[in-house]
Amino acid sequence: MTESHEDGEGELLSRIRELTGAALPIVVSLDLHANITERMVSHASAFCIFRTYPHIDMAATGARCFPILQRLLSGEILYPAMRQASFLVPLSAQYTGASPCKELYQLLPQDSAAGQAHCDIAMGFPPADIYDAGPAVVAYAASQAEADEHAQRIIEAMETKETAFDSALLSADSAVAKAMSHTGSKPVIIADVQDNPGAGATSDTTGLLKALVDGKATDAVLALLHDPQTVAAAQELGEGGIFDAALGGKSGLPDMGSYQARCRVLALSDGEFAFSGAMYAGATAQIGPTALLEIVDSESSVSVLVGSKRCQCLDRAILTHIGIDPGEKKIVAVKSTVHFRDDFEPIADLI
């Protein structure tokens, strides 16, 4: 969606078709969270959609587009079918590494060779809150009947799993208490799913930070809190400096004030580093000046990484670049919904 169009992709494809005519094949790669509309399907020759969340198959999805485009250019006709689910799936329940999404994606044909049906699933993006928000299945085949059969088969399988999409979330206090009671040797990861900037959140709410301090969490770190003003104050003081900070809560959201705390500046960074996880491996991050702060004058042991730009904490390098080894922490709190799993799950006992 855009500020002026509820169906931005449909509008874009419609304008392209006006220029190219109906004969030109157009194969489109889409995000797993796409909200697919009939208008989009009517103007595109085919869709290829990410099949992993975390999205570690972005390049592979582009590669899957090519053989389908070749088929269309060779003269093969692919008939489209689309089915929409009757329910919404929260982003936190769209993880493809576990049931029920794992089983649904196993239903998709893996071969895009000539003559083979092509199917994909989009899980939708509920926060968009548009008419067509929600999961959908697209299928393309040599006949309309075959395309309809594939789309119907997959959407019916999805409908049977509606109650399996777990939307239950812990309160911040409960999550901290559970993490503190854990006795394993590896960290507990707490995902602050309601404040994920990758889904449009402000990344500056402080409820989880307060819960960590009030819950007397030990050896805990939270990342990444968006607060340019606090970063600037820390940069001016320098490492080792102590100051009274009003952390986060500056986005203007109702009932989302700053967290007042006395902080020590542990480390500073220009925020430029290389991502190391599979999702963005090799890409250079430029998240602006950052400051690692320690909450002092409390019975807890909590540090918080504060940034001057919003960045979903989906890669361990966000922490390691400033000297924090998340694998050595007891609790790692991340402002992310699912993307963090690819890089953080291997070091964790519990999420």
List each language-model region with its residue ranges.
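C-terminal functional extensions of proteins
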Residues: 66, 73, 78, 345, ...
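Internal, active-site/partner-interface "lid" segment
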Residues: 73-101
